[in-house]
A protein has these predicted regions:
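Faces of alpha-helical transmembrane segments in polytopic inner-membrane proteins
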Residues: 156-163
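The first (N-terminal) embedded transmembrane alpha-helix
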Residues: 3-23
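Aspartate-rich (DDxxD/NDxxD/DxxxD) Mg2+/diphosphate-binding motifs
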Residues: 40-92
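Membrane interfacial helix-start motif at the N-side
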Residues: 1-9, 73-75, 121
């Protein structure tokens, strides 16, 4: 469910975070923030995959690409998957609490986007917009982590990443 063997999702989540950190810090983010965002990207990508697997578990058995996922095969129970999800979200919260209050506040929006995305596949033909917002949300978080503010210019980077 964490998908250690498919790191591209973590890289795609991490890239905007690093752009935000580098731009907000004018080229030299602290090693602490870089490390925290690297770990955070992995943890939140894993939480997103777990949420997606939980949400789609009744459909995944009908799709060739997803029919062998642990929830579909019974290798992992729903309770175990929920424990994993809450553990990942708890770890993400602990990580972000090491930064500053504005970043913590923004992280709740990021978590909400992560949790809502799989459900959007049922209600809209453009769930990728929500996924793009989730993947781009690390940009405002990075600016908040570096500057403890939300400068207006960060939204141009957010929009460029979203599109």
């Amino acid at each position: 469910m964490i998908r250690f063997d498919k790191p591209i999702g973590t890289y795609l989540l991490l890239a905007p975070a690093l752009w935000g950190l580098i731009i907000a810090s004018e080229g030299l983010p602290t090693p602490f923030l870089v490390f925290t965002f690297i770990v955070g990207a992995f943890v939140m990508r894993s939480a997103g995959c777990t949420t997606n697997d939980l949400t789609d578990r009744k459909l995944d058995g009908f799709v060739e690409r997803t029919r062998n996922r642990p929830l579909v095969t019974g290798e992992v129970s729903v309770i175990e998957a929920l424990c994993l999800l809450f553990g990942l979200l708890g770890l993400a919260l602990w990580l972000v609490m090491q930064i500053n209050w504005l970043t913590v506040q923004l992280s709740f929006i990021g978590a909400a986007l992560t949790i809502v995305y799989p459900f959007m596949k049922r209600f809209t033909h453009l769930p990728q917009v929500v996924l793009g917002m989730a993947f781009s949300w690390s940009i405002p978080m990075a600016f908040a982590a570096v500057t403890a503010t939300m400068p207006a210019g960060l939204w141009w980077l957010f929009l460029a990443n979203l599109l």
